[in-house]
Swiss-Prot record:
Keywords per UniProt: Magnesium, Manganese, Metal-binding, Thiamine pyrophosphate, Transferase
Pfam family, one: TPP_enzyme_M_2
Protein name, as recorded: 2-succinyl-5-enolpyruvyl-6-hydroxy-3-cyclohexene-1-carboxylate synthase
Co-factor: note: Binds 1 thiamine pyrophosphate per subunit.
Lineage: Bacteria, Bacillati, Cyanobacteriota, Cyanophyceae, Oscillatoriophycideae
Cofactor(s) in the UniProt record: Mg(2+); Mn(2+); thiamine diphosphate
Listed EC numbers: 2.2.1.9
One of the GO BP terms on file: phylloquinone biosynthetic process
Family: Belongs to the TPP enzyme family. MenD subfamily.
Pathway: Quinol/quinone metabolism; 1,4-dihydroxy-2-naphthoate biosynthesis; 1,4-dihydroxy-2-naphthoate from chorismate: step 2/7; Cofactor biosynthesis; phylloquinone biosynthesis
Length: 569
């Protein structure tokens, strides 16, 4: 793209955006506003960058988060000055906690208009606290080549800080003086005449710097161990699953795989898979019988409270394998961290194919028995209950479907009931901060220009983010929303507070009594109320090629809780 020399602000904006384009930026998400005009114009006119306007900043930020999860590279997020910037905050927190690269560009008033009650002006410097990987304020635009070089190099640094050493958020605050519109300014003509665009950008590379990992050398592991594969959304799920399968085979260890890990969807790669660990560990005798001598934990711990409590009880040595510098041990156990990708583990652990196979086979025997019980129970259930939904999704969804699983009960039912399969379903999630805000917008971002995708969510999580439906105007792709409508917060029904009503129903369950058919009509969303399981199976077996569709499953919250407590716990 040619640099825009119409005035100082268009020059500044186009240098910034051209630098990002050469670094590999594909998409910019823009919320409307006046102060951000130079950034908006530069993004909108660049032929290699897709600029998407999203009205609501909070929704825009989660949409960008979803895009970045799908693309595995930074997405730019732009807004005007003032409180608009604060609406990015929830997504900033989630991006930081889940290591998603976002480059946030907040426009601002120039310094002389701050602290003087100028309109739409707040203190935006370091607005997001300690959540960004890096943050800085760019100087006001200036028409000299040294300042343009400064801008270019700062943007290059910001891009790589989004990715290295850990993916996350970078915040740049950019003040602009008037005129914000691209009105001509003849004073910068001399700079244009002496500007060599190709020479100016020639050194920019899309190749990241190499990262060196300090790896602890381990001579041997105990023969009686387990691998715990926590939530993960790797760019190449097959190689990720293969690396864990190779480790399991070399050590003869069973793998306890979370539903938010791709392992359950690549079961053919791994005959050592255990998926019913939550149910098995509710049995006091098995908790003792299945105690290992060592645990290899891949990434974060699974959601299961039973598993976490058991690990606290046994307190055996645990190696946490993950490249990020975070502490992934909320249990404060006997842990050591190996800061390396599982795919790079190689021969760190010597082959122990003669290890204690009886221990691994014991896990597999109990897992097969528990799986048979769960499958029979769910297959026989004709009433619409929440737990059967993820169980059927894992069997009927088209292969390789991306599925965003909302927080609260959907992630837990997936962990409890999802069977292993070879359908290569790709799970996505916002488990960095585990909130229910922004789930719809994130799912739309994941589905954008992707294969037909799916969102599994509860009613309260969906209602938290109905502004996400405004993205429909610009949405390209297919998203099917599975709405579990239990008229309130189902997770609270499982807690002791449920026995105290009042105030339980009004202040904890908080039913909203929304007509979702009417809500969908408002936004032009295709709606269908599921009548029975056959209807549901037919609707999810073939996903639409385009558009947004909502399938509502109405569940009785009290009955569902009673079913779970009677049949599972």
């Amino acid at each position: 793209m040619s640099i825009d020399f119409r005035n100082l602000n268009t020059l500044w904006g186009s240098i910034l955006v051209e630098t990002l384009a050469r670094l590999g930026l594909k998409i910019g998400v823009v919320s409307p506003g006046s102060r951000s005009t130079p950034l908006t114009i530069a993004l909108a006119r660049h032929p290699q960058i897709e600029a998407i306007p999203i009205l609501d900043e909070r929704s825009a930020a989660f949409f960008a988060l979803g895009l970045a999860k799908q693309l595995y590279q930074p997405v730019v997020l732009v807004c005007t000055s003032g409180t608009a910037t604060a609406n990015f905050y929830p997504a900033v927190i989630e991006a930081k906690e889940s290591h998603v690269p976002l480059l946030i560009l907040t426009a601002d008033r120039p310094p002389e208009l701050r602290h003087a009650h100028a309109g739409q002006t707040i203190d935006q410097v370091k607005l997001y606290g300690n959540y960004p990987n890096w943050q800085a304020e760019i100087s006001c635009p200036s028409a000299n080549i040294e300042r343009l070089r400064y801008l270019r190099q700062t943007i290059i640094h910001a891009w790589w800080r989004c990715l290295d050493p850990v993916p996350g958020v970078v915040h740049l605050n950019l003040p602009f003086r008037d005129p914000l519109a691209p009105t001509p300014d003849l004073e910068i003509n001399n700079l244009e005449a002496n500007f060599d665009q190709e020479a100016f950008f020639s050194h920019i590379s899309r190749q990241n710097i190499a990262i060196n990992h300090s790896i602890l050398q381990i001579n041997s592991l105990p023969s009686k161990g387990i691998i715990i594969a926590g939530l993960a959304s790797p760019q190449n799920p097959e190689s990720y699953c293969q690396a864990i399968a190779d480790l399991a085979r070399s050590q003869q260890y069973p793998i306890l795989a979370e539903a938010l890990s791709p392992l359950r969807n690549y079961a053919g790669l791994n005959p050592h898979l255990i998926t019913t660990y939550d149910l098995l560990l509710r049995n006091p005798a098995l908790r003792t019988q299945l105690t290992p001598d060592v645990v290899l934990q891949i990434g974060e711990l699974p959601t299961s409270k039973e598993l976490r409590t058991w690990l606290e009880e046994i307190d055996c040595p645990r190696w946490i394998i993950d490249p990020h510098p975070d502490n992934y041990d909320p249990l404060q156990g006997k842990t050591g961290h190996l800061r390396v990708n599982i795919e790079q583990l190689g021969d760190l652990f010597p082959d122990k194919t003669d290890n204690n196979r009886e221990y691994r086979q014991l896990w597999q025997k109990f897992d097969q028995q528990a799986r048979l019980t769960i499958d029979r129970l769910l297959a026989a259930e004709t009433k619409l209950i929440e737990g059967k939904i993820p169980w059927l999704l894992s069997q009927y969804l088209p292969p390789r479907t991306p599925i965003f699983i909302s927080n609260s009960m959907p992630v837990r039912y997936a962990e409890f009931f999802n069977p292993p399969s070879d359908r290569q379903i790709r799970p996505y999630f916002n488990r960095g901060a585990n909130g229910i805000d922004g789930n719809l917008s994130t799912a739309i971002g994941i589905a954008y220009k992707n294969v037909p995708s799916l969102l599994l969510t509860g009613d309260l999580a969906l209602l938290h983010d109905t502004n996400g439906f405004l993205i429909k105007k610009y949405f390209v792709g297919s998203l099917t929303i599975i709405l579990i409508n239990n008229k309130g917060g189902g997770i609270f029904q499982m807690l002791p507070i449920a026995k105290f009503d009042p105030p339980f129903e009004e202040f904890f369950a908080t039913p909203q009594n929304i007509d979702f058919c009417q809500l969908c009509r408002t936004y032009g969303i295709d709606y269908h109320l599921i009548s029975d399981w056959t209807d549901f199976e037919q609707k999810i077996a073939v996903l639409p090629e385009s558009g947004i569709r909502l399938l509502e499953i109405s569940c009785d919250r009290a009955f569902n809780t009673q079913w779970f407590l009677s049949n599972y716990v």
